[in-house]
């Protein structure tokens, strides 16, 4: 949405794809990032009304802008109105449960949105004096994350995983848990991904009853680079309102952060900037920093961001993922191997990392238990080749014990999700961090070496596992 406060009127002089040049009267040039409203009729008589964002002042009374929608049908000489302000989008509770485009216009065919307030998508990062510097764990209620790769409140998390390993379900569960346990809300920014995926996500949110706690902002693959480059800022702006005005904890999902960089690269080339390494824009670090620095904890609330990261050609040294990694506090890696074993969430306990997992932050007990779980699982992984060739019987008694315990730990890291109840028939579980630590401590110490590993599969806390073991024993007797 654009707010027209000034009425400097110019006209279009050149159109090259999504890039538009406009000429304005002397002394009335629009500022960088101002929104221009383009109005006119096509040769066939159709009305055109679209928004562009000023990117360059060319001199000679001309500006260069990038369009937020397709420029099909545009002709030279059309009117360009300077709105006098950057793109502004609606913010507040009325955005929850709705889908918006980059301009903050609803695209879900559910009618207009009640606009209480509007924010500019270009905002400064919070002041240093307003930031919370004490690291604090953001409890998700998901055992494997809270124990082995905990999220930082106001931090940035990279979500890595291929198709069909459970990214969407994990995102839905996080949205459910922040709403139910933290009275928080979520904003989902679909940046340059498939329209079909955006549609599927909306329907899945609807089915799992989390749609009312999330605002969706889409700038999909088929849209011009201007829209894909700015849709992340639109989603972030909506999240900032909930943090700064509503004083809530917010989860911001960006899928996919690589597409944000890719769109910036396209725009940079169209604007005639000299490319840098691998053809990326020379301003890559600055653009990424401008977005990421706004995602943080303040004295009012927090924005915790989960960002799906596509790694081109699996090359982690590519400038796009490499620049992203510099900002991440944690990584959650989803494993196809675990998914094929039926262990959900399929979070890889050995590949997922977090800067929070250190004794000074989580405490000695949590740290030692997490490292104990990881070393047991690593030893099991090392032994798998031997088991495949020689079988379990050829292992030493110590190694047999490690394998037995590791298989229990692996299954105990699985958990039924609230949002998957309709598929699994099992009620979802939110497990507090204290219960998670206490449960894994006892399993690691070998207290339950005599229990069947099946008792630990898809349960919440340890009490539930013991109850399941008793049930299995009773069934075995009968």
Swiss-Prot record:
Annotated binding of ATP, by residue: 161-168
Reactions mediated catalytically: ATP + H2O + 4 H(+)(in) = ADP + phosphate + 5 H(+)(out)
Compartment annotation: Cell inner membrane
Topology in membrane: Peripheral membrane protein
Keywords: ATP synthesis, ATP-binding, Cell inner membrane, Cell membrane, CF(1), Hydrogen ion transport, Ion transport, Membrane, Nucleotide-binding, Translocase, Transport
Any one cellular-component term (Gene Ontology): plasma membrane
One family name in Pfam for this protein: ATP-synt_ab_N
Keyword Cell wall biogenesis/degradation appears in the UniProt entry: no
Xref: Gene3D superfamilies: 2.40.10.170, Bovine Mitochondrial F1-atpase, Atp Synthase Beta Chain, Chain D, domain 3, P-loop containing nucleotide triphosphate hydrolases
Top enzyme category: translocase
GO MF terms, alphabetically ordered: ATP binding; ATP hydrolysis activity; proton-transporting ATP synthase activity, rotational mechanism
Enzyme Commission number, as recorded: 7.1.2.2
InterPro entries, alphabetized: AAA+_ATPase, ATP-synt_VA_C, ATP_synth_F1_bsu, ATPase_alpha/beta_chains, ATPase_F1/V1/A1_a/bsu_N, ATPase_F1/V1/A1_a/bsu_N_sf, ATPase_F1/V1/A1_a/bsu_nucl-bd, ATPase_F1/V1_b/a_C
Subunit architecture: F-type ATPases have 2 components, CF(1) - the catalytic core - and CF(0) - the membrane proton channel. CF(1) has five subunits: alpha(3), beta(3), gamma(1), delta(1), epsilon(1). CF(0) has four main subunits: a(1), b(1), b'(1) and c(9-12).
Biological role stated in the UniProt entry: Produces ATP from ADP in the presence of a proton gradient across the membrane. The catalytic sites are hosted primarily by the beta subunits.
Membership in a protein family: Belongs to the ATPase alpha/beta chains family.
PANTHER family recorded: ATP SYNTHASE, ATP SYNTHASE SUBUNIT BETA, MITOCHONDRIAL
Protein name: ATP synthase subunit beta
Species this chain originates from: Gloeobacter violaceus (strain ATCC 29082 / PCC 7421)
């Amino acid at each position: 949405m654009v707010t027209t406060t000034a009425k400097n009127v110019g006209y279009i002089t050149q159109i090259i794809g999504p890039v538009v040049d406009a000429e304005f009267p002397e002394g009335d040039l629009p500022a960088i990032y101002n929104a221009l409203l383009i109005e006119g009729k096509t040769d066939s008589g159709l009305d055109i009304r679209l928004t562009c964002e000023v990117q360059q002042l060319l001199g000679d009374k001309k500006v260069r802008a990038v369009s937020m929608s397709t420029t099909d049908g545009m002709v030279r000489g059309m009117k360009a109105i300077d709105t006098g302000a950057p793109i502004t989008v609606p913010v507040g509770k009325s955005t929850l449960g709705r889908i918006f485009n980059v301009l903050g216009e609803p695209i879900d065919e559910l009618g207009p949105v009640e606009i209480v307030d509007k924010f500019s998508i270009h905002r400064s990062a919070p002041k240093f004096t307003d930031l919370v510097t004490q690291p604090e764990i953001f409890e998700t209620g998901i055992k494997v994350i809270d124990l082995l790769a905990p999220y930082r409140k106001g931090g940035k998390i990279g979500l890595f995983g291929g198709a069909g390993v459970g990214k969407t379900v994990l995102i839905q569960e996080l949205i459910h848990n922040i709403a139910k346990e933290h009275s928080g809300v979520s904003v989902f920014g679909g940046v340059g991904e498939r329209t079909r995926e955006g549609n599927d996500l909306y329907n899945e949110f609807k089915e799992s009853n989390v749609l009312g706690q999330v605002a969706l902002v889409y700038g999909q693959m088929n849209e011009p680079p201007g829209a894909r480059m700015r849709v992340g800022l639109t989603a972030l702006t909506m999240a900032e309102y909930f943090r700064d005005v509503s004083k809530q904890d917010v989860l911001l999902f960006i899928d996919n952060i690589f597409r944000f960089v890719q769109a910036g690269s396209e725009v940079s080339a169209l604007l005639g900037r000299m490319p840098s390494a691998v053809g990326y824009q020379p301003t890559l670090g600055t653009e990424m920093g401008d977005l990421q620095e706004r995602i943080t904890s303040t004295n009012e609330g927090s924005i915790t961001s989960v960002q799906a990261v596509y790694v081109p050609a699996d090359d982690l040294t590519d400038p796009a993922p490499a620049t992203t990694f510099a900002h991440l506090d944690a990584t959650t890696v989803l494993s196809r191997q675990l998914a094929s074993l039926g262990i959900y969430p399929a979070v890889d306990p050995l590949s997922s990392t977090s800067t929070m997992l250190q004794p000074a932050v989580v405490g000695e007990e949590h740290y030692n238990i997490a490292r104990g779980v990881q070393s047991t699982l690593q030893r099991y992984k090392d032994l798998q080749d031997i088991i495949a060739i020689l079988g379990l019987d050829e292992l030493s008694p110590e190694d047999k014990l490690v394998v037995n315990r590791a298989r229990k730990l692996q299954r105990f890291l699985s958990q039924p999700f609230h949002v998957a109840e309709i598929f699994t028939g099992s009620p979802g579980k939110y497990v507090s961090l204290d219960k998670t630590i206490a449960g894994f401590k006892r399993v690691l110490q070998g207290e339950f070496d005599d229990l069947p590993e099946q008792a630990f599969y898809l349960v919440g806390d340890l009490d539930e596992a013991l109850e399941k073991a008793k049930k299995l024993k009773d069934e075995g007797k009968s």
